Amino acid sequence: MQHKDTAVAKDTAKKRLLRRNSAPSAIHIISRLDKKWSFLWNTIDRHNIVEEQDESSAAKSEEEHEDDYELEQLLNMIRIPMFLEKFMLFALLTSLDCFLYYFTVLPIRLIKGYVKQFKSYRQHYRLQQRSGHKNKIPFRYRITSREYKERCMIFIIVISSILLSKLDTSKLYHRIKRQSTMKLYMLFSVLEMADKMLASLGQSLLTVMLSRKNSERILLHKCLLVSMSLTYVTIHGYVLVYQAISLNIAVNSYSNALLTLLLSMQFAEIKSSVLKKFDKEGFFQITIADVVERFKLTLLLSITGLRNLQSWSSSLSNTSINFWSPRSTLSIVINILCGPMVSVVGSEVLVDWAKHAYITKFNRIRPQIYDKFYYIIYKDYSTRTHKLEDRLGLPLPAFVVLFIVMVRPTLFKSSEPSYLPSLFRILFMGASVFLLALLAKFTLDLILIKWSKRIEQRFRDQAFNTVVTEEEYVPGLLSGGMGKVDVSTRIALHSDYNKENRIETESVSPMRKRKTTLTAECTPPSLNDIRRQKDSKNPRSLENVARYKMVSKRIW
């Protein structure tokens, strides 16, 4: 019994000893947790102290209004469509005025020049009759440089239209329609690139051919330049005919695959241009490119609408007259003419809004810079020269050839079931189209003249110029990447640890005191400094911007 009692006593003593040893371990764990929580709170407090120190430092004083600037940028993105569409509307109307010039004013001037030449010939013939037949002087009429330009342009347009009128557009339509979606995507891309390359080449070629020096060259050089220009206009017109038929297929397809493909190509412009660094010249050039793109889309869709309207009217003539009603006819006509424009041009407008809004945001540009573009286009239009056409890079002769080739069969097919003779019907349709174009040109000129007077009065009161200053930019740091680097960080990144011009910064810690020498001499200029130096070096550089001129890193 005594042995059992001693064993039980030993076990009890061991348990008590274990309890005593376990109690301090729990206390130790709690104390360690306390230390961790205190370290965490000290870290949070330290971050708060650092933020308070940063807010009170001199480096933060320049960025104290950064929130206001960010709010201004958001408001500018909302205001961009108003400024952009005002510029676009004026530029598109002036482009349409230049386009109608080839159908109205140019033929009138050509006829006037030939009438003047005929009158001089008749006057010379009468003088020869009065003086007798003894001293015969051969008749020589020296044409002016303007008459030479007009005759060359009419000759090129007429011959190119005759050559391209031999194309069977229905065969081209079905040949393109049979292709797969991937091939059509490649076709759209190739035609777009070919259009830009030919437009750039044609602008230089036509400028040389229509120059004043060319009218004084020998006949061989003149014929060579005219033949080269004729070849260019014919090839460019052929490319534009392919573009018009491809767009017609995409718009008229029963499935939305081709139209979706076309819209996706438009939205691809955002990816290629938004996340880029722009200067004022590049921004003006991409705005001009958007004007040309929208004008070309409107022209191609107008041709598509006229061809669809002609095919619908021919199918309507084969049906019974009992199914016709004015309300249904008007709705069908509106659907044919306005349906493609709403989908394609509407998406183009939305893409332009988003693209310009983000370009101005990333490059910290205020929308008032569109007034500079607006004023430059107004000055080009008011001079009544080809400067506007050269700045915009509009291939108007190729557009005129495209319109004649695609619309001429439509107009004459619509008048086929007529009792009039064929020649008289052609003359009647030609005269009707000419009078309508002349009326549109006259109305458009009145609108633009009135608009130009308002622009002149507005900018005269403000003493406006095309110089871009710091007022056209939102204050703040520009960045080539996704983040921003302030001045002190840039100095630290580009420090050279030299002895000259060093800046000593001390960071005191409880353990030790450390000195770091930073050099501001070797720090390269920031993006803001580069832009400021470039603007001050050439303040009126916007006036030298053209569509196909390398004024920035690339041509848009």
UniProtKB/Swiss-Prot annotation:
Residues 109-151, 246-330, 413-428 are lumenal. Disulfide bonds: none annotated. It is found in: Endoplasmic reticulum membrane; Mitochondrion. Keywords: Endoplasmic reticulum, Glycoprotein, Membrane, Mitochondrion, Phosphoprotein, Transmembrane, Transmembrane helix. It comes from the Eukaryota. GO terms for biological process: protein folding in endoplasmic reticulum. It is a multi-pass membrane protein. GO terms for cellular component: cell periphery; endoplasmic reticulum; endoplasmic reticulum membrane; mitochondrion. Glycans are attached at N318. The modification Phosphoserine is found at S22. Pfam families: DUF747. Residues 1-87, 173-224, 352-391, 450-556 are cytoplasmic. The chain crosses the membrane at residues 88-108, 152-172, 225-245, 331-351, 392-412, 429-449. InterPro entries: Tatp1. Its main location: endoplasmic reticulum. Belongs to the TAPT1 family. May be involved in membrane protein folding. Interacts with SLP1. This is Endoplasmic reticulum membrane protein 65. The gene is EMP65.
